[in-house]
Amino acid sequence: MATLKDQLIHNLLKEEQTPQNKITVVGVGAVGMACAISILMKDLADELALVDVIEDKLKGEMMDLQHGSLFLRTPKIVSGKDYNVTANSKLVIITAGARQQEGESRLNLVQRNVNIFKFIIPNVVKYSPNCKLLIVSNPVDILTYVAWKISGFPKNRVIGSGCNLDSARFRYLMGERLGVHPLSCHGWVLGEHGDSSVPVWSGMNVAGVSLKTLHPDLGTDKDKEQWKEVHKQVVESAYEVIKLKGYTSWAIGLSVADLAESIMKNLRRVHPVSTMIKGLYGIKDDVFLSVPCILGQNGISDLVKVTLTSEEEARLKKSADTLWGIQKELQF
């Protein structure tokens, strides 16, 4: 007896269903799900896989997204505790880890998250040996280093979300002051994601007009307009949002989808993301810090050599020394 499906549909070929543009998100907390929905809304994948250790939450999140399939263009959404669901991913985004508590520094989280990565990374590598790894868990610069060490991947394929969000926050606040959309406000925050990030005042511009040239005191203590406050707000904003709502999610999710778009579509846009910076700015250790990187289908293909003042360079070097001080103590 022919089934309804057989009566309705005449099959022409037996297809091998291998995804061409698969993305995996590891960790379905607030950040992971914000990344997932942002990626779905941008139509970046033909398959989305979710992985977590909390099975009920994982299944619930998957079902909730699947129920929105009519409004999306991602034909397959899967999940599982077992990493076989991640097989053949082009991009694997790691958001799993212990959550930053109110008032806790990102660096405090580190050994807790290293132990989690020792389980996650080998499993990802086993099923998607050619993927790009995008690390979002904090402290992101150290955990990107950890992922690079554990995975054995070349450095172009291990990317930290780094200062992409810090720079976005900076451009938003700059835009608020000037009454201009953030897309037209150019400014870069580099170095360590978080407390010791470095704003590059000399590069701030609107329509190619340098703000520092118009206002030489920009970013200094003697600045009457106190533009330094803008960077201070960038640093404090995550802590403030955590204090108010318990965690941050939407902005980091959108920021990660922005990076995913450059990778999946081979756009070769420039983003401030965390990469291995040894040999630059007098840094001699294996540390990952954010500098402007060209992102495409192979991950980070190139980086832009930013002209920094001696003070900015010194701050970058200090960040590197701090990170290395922590990294060399880590137990793998």
Curated annotation (Swiss-Prot):
**What superkingdom does the record give?**
Eukaryota
Crosslink position(s): Glycyl lysine isopeptide (Lys-Gly) (interchain with G-Cter in SUMO2): K57
Which residues, renumbered to this chain, carry the PTM N-acetylalanine? A2
Which pathway is this protein engaged in?
A: Fermentation; pyruvate fermentation to lactate; (S)-lactate from pyruvate: step 1/1
Which positions does the record annotate as the modified residue N6-acetyllysine? K5, K14, K57, K81, K118, K126, K224, K232, K243, K318
Q: Provide one Gene Ontology biological process annotation.
A: pyruvate metabolic process
Q: Which family does it belong to?
A: Belongs to the LDH/MDH superfamily. LDH family.
Task: Tell me the function of this protein.
Answer: Interconverts simultaneously and stereospecifically pyruvate and lactate with concomitant interconversion of NADH and NAD(+).
Entry protein name: L-lactate dehydrogenase A chain
Gene giving rise to this polypeptide: LDHA
